[in-house]
């Protein structure tokens, strides 16, 4: 879909050496965005870079007692090459996540101070940390799942949440050891503010289509075949569920 096409353009983008001379990442993002797209990387995987693409749609809000409230989130249990990553141990790898979605704008609020009155809804993503359990991750992201006992490690991301969430194509990446990445196999896509939530009318049942793109990149060890095997072993098993 076009959601995935534009997501892959951003997902493949890299900062040039000249762009990297701007040391402050926030300033670099303001001036250069995500960098220069790589057409070959956007179209093809290779032995050292495997990409997952998930297309879905989320109903961000539901009707509450006194108004619209946040709906459920999508929880992805990824078909992960866990054994291969564990065997790679301390080798440094990169996981990159891109979320591309569409909104319906409210033109009357364009350019005004309240940024959440322009988009109909906003979506965001989060990734399980290497040290938290599946239950702890769910509780951290959804208070209905139980008491929150862990915190998100915001320092692990390169772009950081506040900067990446300013648009409808959000991309960020983490560089870590393969052993740590082996434990980071869960992603959630969840709703944020938007004018659909503030105005009752008929907006509560509306859904937001999105594309979630996830890549594992390595420098030394081939990863593509291990990812392909992990996917083959999960055929017929749901990867995403509402929670």
Segments the model singles out, each with a brief description of its role:
Residues 1-243:
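Topogenic and prosegment regions of secretory-pathway hydrolases and membrane enzymes
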